[in-house]
Amino acid sequence: MASTADFKNGLVLQIDGQLWQIVEFQHVKPGKGPAFVRTKLKNVVSGKVVDKTYNAGVKVETATVDRRDATYLYRDGSDFVFMDSEDFEQHPLPEALVGRLAGFLLESMPVQIAFHDGVPLYLELPVTVELLVAHTEPGLQGDRSSAGTKPATMETGAEIQVPLFINTGDKLKVDSRDGSYLGRVNA
C-alpha cells in the first residue's frame, strides 16, 4: 500500500486486478476544497492510457515489480532474446511486448526488464540511444522559409524526423521514449 504522497513516475499500481503504471502525476491544491492528485496511468498489459484523480492521502495498492538488468542478444522469429545480467538466464520476449521499442534495439544494448510474479511486463531502454542513419534523402536548404525536417531510416529500421543537414551514414543520438532527434554524435 502506498499513499498519494508516495506517487512517482514508473510506480506500478494494482487497480481492480490489473496493473497500471504512473506515466505522470500532478499534486493539486486548489484555493477552495481539499488537495488531490491528478494522474495519467498506463495499463501495463494493453498499453491503454487513462486519467484518474485521487484525493490527497488516499492509500492505493501497489504491485511488486522486479526490475532486472539485461542485455539484448538477438531476434529469433517474432521473439527478442535478452540475457539476464545477474544469472545469465535468457528471456525471450514476444514482439507484442517489445512494441515500438524494437526500432531502437541494438545487439549488446543494456536494458531493464520489469517482472511481476516471474512474468515479464515491459521493457525499458536507455533514454538516449546512438544509431546510424541507413538512408535519408539529401536536404535542399533553400526551399523553405524556416528550419525543416525530413524522414530518415535508422540502422534498426526505425524512421525518425531529422534536420535537413543530416546525411546517410551519420551517427545520431535519439530519444528512445518518443523517437525524437537529439543531435549528432561526434566521431
UniProtKB/Swiss-Prot annotation:
Molecular functions (GO terms): translation elongation factor activity
Pfam families given in the database record: EFP, EFP_N, Elong-fact-P_C
Gene3D superfamilies from the UniProt entry: 2.30.30.30, Nucleic acid-binding proteins
Recorded superkingdom: Bacteria
Pathway membership: Protein biosynthesis; polypeptide chain elongation
Record localization: Cytoplasm
Main location as per UniProt: cytoplasm
Function of the molecule: Involved in peptide bond synthesis. Stimulates efficient translation and peptide-bond synthesis on native or reconstituted 70S ribosomes in vitro. Probably functions indirectly by altering the affinity of the ribosome for aminoacyl-tRNA, thus increasing their reactivity as acceptors for peptidyl transferase.
Family stated for the protein in its record: Belongs to the elongation factor P family.
Protein name in UniProt: Elongation factor P
